[in-house]
Amino acid sequence: MGGGLMQLVAYGAQDIYLSGNPQITFFKVVYRRHTNFSMESIEQTFNGFPNFGKKVTCPISRNGDLIHRIYLQATVTDSIASPGLTKWAGHKLIKSVEVEIGGQRIDKHYADWLHIWNELTQTAGHWDGYKLMVNGTTASQTVAPGATTVSKTMFIPLQFWFCRNPGLALPLIALQYHEVKINLEFGDSADVMGASGASLDSAALYVDYIYLDTDERRRFAQVSHEYLIEQLQFTGDESASSKIKLNFNHPVKELIWVEKASGDGVGEYDTTYDSAKLQLNGHERFTQRTPQYFQLVQPYQHHERVPTTCVLTVDASSIETDEAVMETCTTGGINVYSFALKPEEHQPSGTCNMSRIDNATLNLQGVDTDNTVKVFAVNYNVLRVMSGMGGLAYSN
């Protein structure tokens, strides 16, 4: 008897729990047929001239039935000499961006949030490519001999709920009476280009439209919809203190905070506090923990990536030994506390309803009071679309 057959007949009572009354096979593929659809990325133009420090609005045209991903494409002329395009310039370019339906703001994101979300969720396979998309590196580029400038184009993906999940694509076909707008405030030239007085060569939004087949299109237009969406809450820069009041609402899946010294830009985060704890109505949510718990353990448990910065250094004195190249890693300064098992997924896996908490405070012991602290909360809400209009089921 061959070894494979011997394994096959070595079947006992315990195997009943694994392969008794089987429900699937690994040796016959099963697939499901999907509805007919197509996608197309179409450029949208701003009302107003897009430039550093400006606020512009982009009405989303009704080219298709649903909208999914949105990218900001921006081109700048970068100086080869210093100062030049700064690191993470793509994130810094978007000071804030919000989506508006029928005049109601549904969600708003910020430059720091775009950076934080990338640091926590970007996969290893996409990391280097994403850095090129948003200029997440200070590496020099190959230019023509004698040239003093080089044109650079950045592609910055927006991270609204409908951009990250095709099942939450925004149904324009069901919003006949409400206009969808993207309101964008550009960052300062000094933050993005390293010098004031520069200007954008061009900027536009590219929206991925989804076209549905006749039957599904009719169904989307006629019936009402309820979407469980994610929103970002941010109460503004707080002066660093031992007690920071958290004025948040709705079921929150995670809290994220960063500490910034004066003059720090996007992606430049400080850590001066010795320990932190969260209090809800005067009760400790967890015992006091050190920064390493929030910057390493929590991201490791709940996110795709643990934000760290690693630098390779060469020790010239031991160049012929294995210790010649040393890697030094530090935490990224991004603090996380998750109420959910898997906060990156749309499927709810744990929340804390902050609407039912009268007094929530984040206690930071030993924090430098000259710094500022930004605290973000990711919450669930319900977007209702009916009778050609859309709005939130629960307001603040």
From Swiss-Prot:
DNA-binding as UniProt keyword: no
Protein name: Major capsid protein
Keywords noted in UniProt: Capsid protein, Virion
GO CC, alphabetical: viral capsid
Species this protein is from: Pyramimonas orientalis virus (PoV01)
Keyword Manganese: no
Record's function text: Major protein of the capsid.
Pfam families in the cross-refs: Capsid_N, Capsid_NCLDV
Molecular function via GO: structural molecule activity
Locations listed in the record: Virion
Major subcellular location class: virion
Family: Belongs to the NCLDV major capsid protein family.
